[in-house]
């Protein structure tokens, strides 16, 4: 069956291109694009709160590597059979992060550890920094979901809905045909039509992004409460999407593990929103110590002020001659 069914939209013919021996993967490019978008948006939000935009990029040098490692570790922990189970892909495949497989929960958790280390170096509060970065993170997640589209992965159950996603068989360089081939090229042969769950989550993430921008502009959410709002909102969307997915996943009591994670993380985020301090941090508390020292001069001591005053009085006094004094008295 090779014809395009009316109303359905096709998956991309490939997810990787080659420049000589160098593979260019759409998934990796979109992850990089998402990181750049998160830094641009986060830098502007941080500056709007009173911080220095450059600090965002400095802390990213800590947060991004930690986040990538955390995302991969979460994926390996929750899908370990794919790599280390019977007939698993092995350690080499586990290290190939560019092939896909990042768990957002691990990325956020370990990314926060990296951000905490960066914030300590710059002497700024982590919760406030998280608030500024939250809109950028959810936007990066939306962009990253396009990588799943190119990889033909993380889709839902088969469907006859008019917006279904057509998944085609792909043939890899060795001649093996599989719809899940990351290095293959589409043969045009339709494998199945599925729910485009990547698209559902992408749309949800974009809506959350605009909602966070609106809330950040019109409400004084600080002390990590905007970041917790992002986490709670994402959990709602992710929980609903997990109900539609049908790809291989670890289950607990017949429920996908990401559904459990979404539930417990959502509860934790709501509790944090309730218990965290109200209001927002003062702008002067969001700057590095050396930046504040440059902008705000140290007050003069009493001795220095007295010295300046006496010097000013001495230099401005005008001597009066005897003739001028006599003229004034007459």
Curated annotation (Swiss-Prot):
<dbReference type="Pfam" id="PF01790">
    <property type="entry name" value="LGT"/>
</dbReference>
<comment type="function">
    <text>Catalyzes the transfer of the diacylglyceryl group from phosphatidylglycerol to the sulfhydryl group of the N-terminal cysteine of a prolipoprotein, the first step in the formation of mature lipoproteins.</text>
</comment>
<dbReference type="GO" id="GO:0008961">
    <property type="term" value="F:phosphatidylglycerol-prolipoprotein diacylglyceryl transferase activity"/>
</dbReference>
<keyword id="KW-0808">Transferase</keyword>
<feature type="transmembrane region" description="Helical">
    <location>
        <begin position="57"/>
        <end position="77"/>
    </location>
</feature>
<comment type="similarity">
    <text>Belongs to the Lgt family.</text>
</comment>
<dbReference type="GO" id="GO:0042158">
    <property type="term" value="P:lipoprotein biosynthetic process"/>
</dbReference>
<keyword id="KW-0812">Transmembrane</keyword>
<feature type="transmembrane region" description="Helical">
    <location>
        <begin position="22"/>
        <end position="42"/>
    </location>
</feature>
<dbReference type="InterPro" id="IPR001640">
    <property type="entry name" value="Lgt"/>
</dbReference>
<feature type="transmembrane region" description="Helical">
    <location>
        <begin position="97"/>
        <end position="117"/>
    </location>
</feature>
<feature type="transmembrane region" description="Helical">
    <location>
        <begin position="257"/>
        <end position="277"/>
    </location>
</feature>
<feature type="transmembrane region" description="Helical">
    <location>
        <begin position="193"/>
        <end position="213"/>
    </location>
</feature>
<protein>
    <recommendedName>
        <fullName>Phosphatidylglycerol--prolipoprotein diacylglyceryl transferase</fullName>
        <ecNumber>2.5.1.145</ecNumber>
    </recommendedName>
</protein>
<dbReference type="GO" id="GO:0005886">
    <property type="term" value="C:plasma membrane"/>
</dbReference>
<comment type="pathway">
    <text>Protein modification; lipoprotein biosynthesis (diacylglyceryl transfer).</text>
</comment>
<keyword id="KW-1133">Transmembrane helix</keyword>
<feature type="binding site">
    <location>
        <position position="145"/>
    </location>
    <ligand>
        <name>a 1,2-diacyl-sn-glycero-3-phospho-(1'-sn-glycerol)</name>
    </ligand>
</feature>
<keyword id="KW-0472">Membrane</keyword>
<keyword id="KW-1003">Cell membrane</keyword>
């Amino acid at each position: 069956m090779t014809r395009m069914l009316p109303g359905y939209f096709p998956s991309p013919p490939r997810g990787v291109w080659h420049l000589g021996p160098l593979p260019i993967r759409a998934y990796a490019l979109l992850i990089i694009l998402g990181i750049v978008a998160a830094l641009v948006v986060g830098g502007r939000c941080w500056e709007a709160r009173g911080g220095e935009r450059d600090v965002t990029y400095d802390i990213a040098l800590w947060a991004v590597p930690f986040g990538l490692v955390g995302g991969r570790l979460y994926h390996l922990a929750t899908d370990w059979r794919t790599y280390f189970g019977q007939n698993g892909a092995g350690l080499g495949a586990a290290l190939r992060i560019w092939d896909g497989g990042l768990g957002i929960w691990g990325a956020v958790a370990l990314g926060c550890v990296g951000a905490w280390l960066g914030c300590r170096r710059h002497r700024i509060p982590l919760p406030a920094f998280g608030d500024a970065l939250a809109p950028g993170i959810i936007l990066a997640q939306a962009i990253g979901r396009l990588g799943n589209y190119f990889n033909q992965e993380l889709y839902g159950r088969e469907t006859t809905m008019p917006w279904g996603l057509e998944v085609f068989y792909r043939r890899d360089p060795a001649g093996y045909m599989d719809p899940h081939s990351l290095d293959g090229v589409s043969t045009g042969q339709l494998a199945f039509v599925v729910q485009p769950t990547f698209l559902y989550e992408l749309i949800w993430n974009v809506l959350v992004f605009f909602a966070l921008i609106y809330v950040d502009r019109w409400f004084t959410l600080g002390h990590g409460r905007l970041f917790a709002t992002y986490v709670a909102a994402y959990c709602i969307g992710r929980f609903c999407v997990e109900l539609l997915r049908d790809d291989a996943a670890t289950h607990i009591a017949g429920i996908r593990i990401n559904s459990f994670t979404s539930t417990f993380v959502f509860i934790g985020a709501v509790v944090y929103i309730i218990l965290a301090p109200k209001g927002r941090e003062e702008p002067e508390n969001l700057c590095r110590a050396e930046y504040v020292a440059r902008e705000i001069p140290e007050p003069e001591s009493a001795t220095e002020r007295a010295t300046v005053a006496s010097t000013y009085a001495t230099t401005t006094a005008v001597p009066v001659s005897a003739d001028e004094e006599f003229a004034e008295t007459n």
